[in-house]
Amino acid sequence: MNDFSRQDHWDKVYTTRGENQVSWFQETPAPSLELIGHVGAIRSSAIIDIGGGASRLVDCLVGQGYEDVTVLDLSAAALASAQSRLGDKANRVKWIAADVTAWEPTRVYDLWHDRAAVHFLTESADKAAYVSRLKAAVKPGGSVIIGTFAPDGPERCSGLIVSRYDAASLAATLGCGFELIDTRRHEHTTPSGVTQRFQFSTFRRGPDR
């Protein structure tokens, strides 16, 4: 799927379905918030949420006083939904409408968070581009939290084939330079009552060589 069709697909999803009509909806993103706390993020930490879309993680981060939050998503429609929900608080957030595989970071971050974005990348070139951006955007010693469908999770989502991971296969995809420091499973219940099995893995970015 090329960049244009990928964007078209996600814009259609976010303009034709309500916020709580998508399978990944969470009223409160508890696993992500817990892991962000575990890596020692402080209020001044630079945090980027990759594929954040209309997720409520940004609401929680702003509400908890985090001062340097960025949300990146391919779909401008998804970002507009989050901005509308936040109202004036949206001005406290930096918003980037871009495909992460083509994005060129202009700064570095203390924490990279991705819940259910990278698993939509199934081509090796897209995965390599993702890792390249990850390496460019996370400072040495920074943290990376990635949640994906587990090996026994769904094979498709929103009509698209996904890549499923466990901690070992995700670590292999990221390659050297990222130390696995935590992994856990999570069962997400969709708005329609279906259970989806996820894995969340946390990595620390090693020093530049």
Model-derived segments and spans:
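Class I (Rossmann-like) S-adenosyl-L-methionine-dependent methyltransferase catalytic domain
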Residues: 1-107, 121-133, 137, 143-209
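A conserved beta-strand element that flanks and buttresses the S-adenosyl-L-methionine
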Residues: 113
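Short catalytic micro-motifs in class I SAM-dependent methyltransferases
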Residues: 116-120
